Amino acid sequence: MPAQISSEDQQLSTKIAERLKRDEAGLVAAVVQQFDSKEVLMLGWMDDEALRRTLRSGRVTFFSRSRQEYWRKGDTSGHIQMVKAVALDCDGDALLISVDQHGPACHTGTRSCFDGRALPAFVEPVFVEPVA
Amino acid sequence: MPAQISSEDQQLSTKIAERLKRDEAGLVAAVVQQFDSKEVLMLGWMDDEALRRTLRSGRVTFFSRSRQEYWRKGDTSGHIQMVKAVALDCDGDALLISVDQHGPACHTGTRSCFDGRALPAFVEPVFVEPVA
């Protein structure tokens, strides 16, 4: 007699699936943050199955919009992301994935996908006390 | 003679616009992070004009997917986001907006839109040394 496999192992639980507000492609945005330094490493996309794999396996899996396929981060590069925690935002269209990132998160070799990519911006004037 | 207004004041600069990889609705994801605590506060959406306003004004402006209109964060609630820095990721489909958030970021009253909204997840087993 084969071992029973619960439907929860095969599909994202209904309770979570009901809270997702997917875009027209069936995806939600997934913000990936290093758990200790709090650095934002990258943003990827997940459908129900990518989220299920991420929650069940301890490794982050995305759905690639350009390649239209699942990719488990690090399978090619070795730069894996071990899941520390996952949260879904108030309106269900964004996930925050807390991870331990091994090596650089970015395919260009930088630690985060935002490193060295600042845009020119006007920021709030800061009041500076004259040095006495 | 009226003051000259450069095209840069009216439109997002071509240099930045060329780097954006917009979705089918013309939007990129914008991750908002508190500049000092590094907490991820929320995720919003920006088109070219919302990004231009954010870069030029020092206040974060999003484009609402549900209401199909611009909203400058805090205009209704008072919970404004002052821009500290903006970066665009390696493939141009995500922005990281570093801000000083006044009050809660979430419309539900929590500091971040992810607070108290964790999903059950399997995480990497952690090796614990027995206490001697």
Curated annotation (Swiss-Prot), chains A, B:
Which Gene Ontology BP annotations are present?
Answer: L-histidine biosynthetic process
Q: Name one Pfam family in it.
A: PRA-CH
Give the binding site residues for Zn(2+). 90, 106, 113
| Keywords associated with the record | Amino-acid biosynthesis, Cytoplasm, Histidine biosynthesis, Hydrolase, Magnesium, Metal-binding, Zinc
Q: Where in the cell is it found?
A: Cytoplasm
Cellular component per GO? Answer: cytoplasm
Cofactor info, note text: Binds 1 Mg(2+) ion per subunit. Binds 1 zinc ion per subunit.
The source's superkingdom equals Bacteria
Residues annotated to bind Mg(2+): 89, 91, 93
Q: Does the keyword Cytoplasm apply?
A: yes
A GO molecular function held by the record: magnesium ion binding
EC number(s) reported in the record? 3.5.4.19
Cofactor(s) in the UniProt record: Mg(2+); Zn(2+)
Which transformation does this protein catalyse, written as a reaction? Answer: 1-(5-phospho-beta-D-ribosyl)-5'-AMP + H2O = 1-(5-phospho-beta-D-ribosyl)-5-[(5-phospho-beta-D-ribosylamino)methylideneamino]imidazole-4-carboxamide
Pathway membership, UniProt: Amino-acid biosynthesis; L-histidine biosynthesis; L-histidine from 5-phospho-alpha-D-ribose 1-diphosphate: step 3/9
InterPro entries in the record: PRA-CH, PRib_AMP_CycHydrolase_dom, PRib_AMP_CycHydrolase_sf
Q: How does it assemble?
A: Homodimer.
Family the entry assigns: Belongs to the PRA-CH family.
Q: Which PANTHER family match?
A: HISTIDINE BIOSYNTHESIS BIFUNCTIONAL PROTEIN, PHOSPHORIBOSYL-AMP CYCLOHYDROLASE
Role noted for this protein: Catalyzes the hydrolysis of the adenine ring of phosphoribosyl-AMP.
Name this protein carries in UniProt:
Phosphoribosyl-AMP cyclohydrolase
This chain's source organism reads: Renibacterium salmoninarum (strain ATCC 33209 / DSM 20767 / JCM 11484 / NBRC 15589 / NCIMB 2235)
Lineage of origin: Bacteria, Bacillati, Actinomycetota, Actinomycetes, Micrococcales
What's the name of its gene?
A: hisI
